[in-house]
């Protein structure tokens, strides 16, 4: 999917290789377990965002945002990728693997594997 906009009241699942320079708005969940989100943004009202990879090695601006509550998970996140849950956000400055983002005690918490890197 390239240069597109998708809006759904429930779940969005992408089975192809990736989303490039696109905007995805989902009510409950966004999944692209075997692909990349490179450029653009994914916004979920309440639920999870799951991707194999966010951003790209050149630092293309990419955003994953959950409006209310949920988790963001990715195998790989590149620099200049922003993640947010509610009003709290974090921007990656280096390539990071095994990423989990969630609210813990109301604080945005970011893990790389078992290492806490924010929160």
Label every PLM stretch briefly.
Residues 2-119:
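Intrinsically disordered, low-complexity terminal regions
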């Amino acid at each position: 999917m390239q240069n597109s906009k998708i809006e759904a009241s429930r779940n969005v699942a992408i089975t192809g290789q990736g989303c490039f320079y696109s905007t995805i708005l989902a009510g409950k969940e966004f999944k692209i377990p075997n692909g990349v989100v490179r450029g653009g943004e994914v916004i979920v009202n309440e639920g999870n965002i799951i991707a194999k990879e966010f951003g790209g090695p050149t630092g293309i601006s990419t955003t994953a945002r959950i409006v209310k509550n949920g988790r963001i998970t990715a195998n790989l996140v590149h620099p200049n990728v922003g993640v947010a849950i509610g009003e709290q956000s974090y921007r990656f400055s280096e390539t990071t693997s095994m990423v989990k983002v969630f609210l813990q005690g109301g604080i945005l918490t970011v893990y790389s594997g078992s290492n806490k890197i924010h929160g």
